[in-house]
Amino acid sequence: MAVKDSLGDRMKEYYEDRAKTYLTRRTPVIIRLDGKAFHSFTKHLKKPHDKIFHDTMNSTMEYLCKNIQGCKFGYTQSDEITLVLVDYDKLETDAWFGYGVQKMCSISASMATLAFNTYFKKYRDEFLDAVSAFQDFDLEADYLEALRKCVDVGALFDSRCFNIPTEEVVNCLIWRQQDATRNAIQMLGQCNFSHRELHGMSCNDIQDMLMLQKDINFNDMPTDYKRGTCCYKKEIPCSDRLVGYKTEWVIDKDPPIFSKDREFVEKWVYIKEC
């Protein structure tokens, strides 16, 4: 027979449980994670596009997609990750932590922090091995020091979660993708022009400056740099199975422009409910 803990029960009932909030069930949920003070964290990394940082964000997104119950779609750009969750595949489908806001935010932020720091060190070590093989220590000395500091300091993420109507999910992703494109243009501009030269310039102005003065066409940049990266489940051919395929999470570095292909996102949330 369990011993009644009157003090513990009172603390939970009167105080701890009173602060708990829950999102609405059977309605899409967005979890958005942001790197804390990443402007400082990435200050001495390569610009406009650091491969180690970019690969780390992609792997962190994939880790979250694989390990957060109900996640259907992930999207990352810059230092942020957006996840789309549903809990209505079937009538009996459970929600992640019952859609408790405190649990979802604290644990997703912890997961992102753990994954990011693990992958960043992994990719830094692989880069260090490559530099060692080609004896490029002098050429990469400053960059190696920047990577060392990043590993020593470590990264942190914050997280927020919220319900969103099914028809608004794609609009949320359009918003973040448009932000990705704007950030990419501005970063490319900052790498080629002074702050004074860019003052008051729109993204279209910056693209024109890059083309006319530097012979750089923004449209020629890698798709994932311009639009971000996605993660979702896909059927993969498999020769060792009778059915001939298996379902795996994949990282898509060539996503469409969401505003021109809404179905690309909507198919993950418009599920026939049971």
Could you say what each language-model-derived stretch is?
Residues 1-274:
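Regulatory and interdomain segments flanking nucleotide-handling catalytic cores
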